[in-house]
Amino acid sequence: PMALCEPCQGIQRNWRKAPGHAELVQRGNRKEDRDTGPVTITRYVCDRCGTAWEYENDKSNQKAGWSVVGR
């Protein structure tokens, strides 16, 4: 598998409100239940390197945010 491209390497993981980058293409979202209530998880794929990301939007968890989910 190829490495993360430079813009993907620059994404701060697991931090609320950290920005993505311009070449991420949204691929839909889903709801999941957490102890504090439902959260929205949005899936993205990088146009440049093909990395699949998810962004978890949880207002009560500062450490929810970007994570790599596949290639």
Q: Where do the model's predicted regions map?
A:
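Small disulfide-bonded, cysteine-rich extracellular recognition modules and tandem repeats
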Residues: 8-11, 56, 69
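Short metal-binding segments enriched for Cys and/or His
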Residues: 33-62
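A short, surface-exposed interaction/processing loop segment used at functional sites
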Residues: 62-71
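Short, structured interface segments that constitute the first stable element of a domain
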Residues: 1-2, 42
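Short recognition patches in nucleic-acid-associated and regulatory proteins
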Residues: 2-37
